[in-house]
Amino acid sequence: MNSEIELFKKNKKGSDKWVKLICGASNEDIVAIEDLSAIYSAAGVDYIDVAADESIVEAARNGIKWAKKLYGASPGLMISISDGKDIHFRKAKFDPLKCPSNCPRPCERICPTFAIDYSGVKENKCYGCGRCINSCPLNLISEYEYKLSNNDLPKTLQTIKPDAVEIHTEINRLDSFIQVANILKTSGIEFKKISVSCGLNQSQKGPKDLLKALWDRYEILVEHNVPLIWQLDGRPMSGDLAPSTGKDTVKLWNNIGSHLPPGLIQLAGGTNEKTHEFLKINNFPDGIAFGSSARKIMQPLIEDANKNNKKLYEYPEKMDLAIKKAQKLLNPWKIS
């Protein structure tokens, strides 16, 4: 396994880094996901991470096929799963009949995916960022869980056959992590990579506790003989899109990066176009994952195309613009 990791690193030329697009573990917007997958595949991402759902995976693969045909780009496909309750696996809801007629509707304005209108929350467009929950002056918005059960996971894996899987976990959830890891091991799927995503924001623990938790999970996964990725989730699902949000994951990297188990090390959680500026030039991790920031810059273009019942990649000029926007985000991590 370690030799495969080293081979991957050697094949990444110069300062080129591993980059992943996060479409959202509870994002069901298949129209946007197809366009996002096409855009970021063409721009040069290494993997695309989507919800564990057959229709969503099909949309992502369609986007990848488009990019492969025109650009020769074919990133791997990863699905996100969880070993327990997790804020990445949620959606928002409210009863629109309870909204006062004179409400300024801050929830609608703040939603990055345009998932809210007078009918409430469009379930397929909501990916659970939580921004609307905090914005409602009457506290009418709540959340509910959107998660694949362990009972359904084996069948889903066989149907989708993803290239990779990411397990979202928490420091104190080792037993449930073992259960999920065993399902992966007995699935019969030859995964190219297994990613473990964990951070501190959902616990009262410190960096040393996180480090121990990741080593515990390494001892479990090392038997799988699959290259591993350790995703340091600095600011998971905060809903905050400010440039400084990437500081939390960089802080985690600085604290424990050199002591992590063997595998690729990836930053996530609040990452954006400014994150690389918070890193020391001679101390970059193996890669980065972009979620909300990557989707936000494309959403207006995708929505505009969708108004005409078309995909963005059916408009060559607009697609060229989208790819350039994506490349600008990726360039600090990829060879320009």
Where are these regions (language model features)?
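Active-site mouth loops of central-metabolism enzymes
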Residues: 16-32, 82-101, 124, 140-150
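Conserved mixed alpha/beta catalytic, RNA-binding, or beta-rich assembly cores of soluble enzyme
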Residues: 23-28, 32-34, 45-46, 52, ...
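Conserved, mostly hydrophobic/aromatic
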Residues: 40, 60, 165
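Non-catalytic positions within long, well-ordered alpha-helices that form the structural scaffold/packing
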Residues: 41, 100, 108, 112, ...
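Iron-sulfur cluster-binding cysteine motifs and their immediate structural context
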Residues: 104-122, 131-148
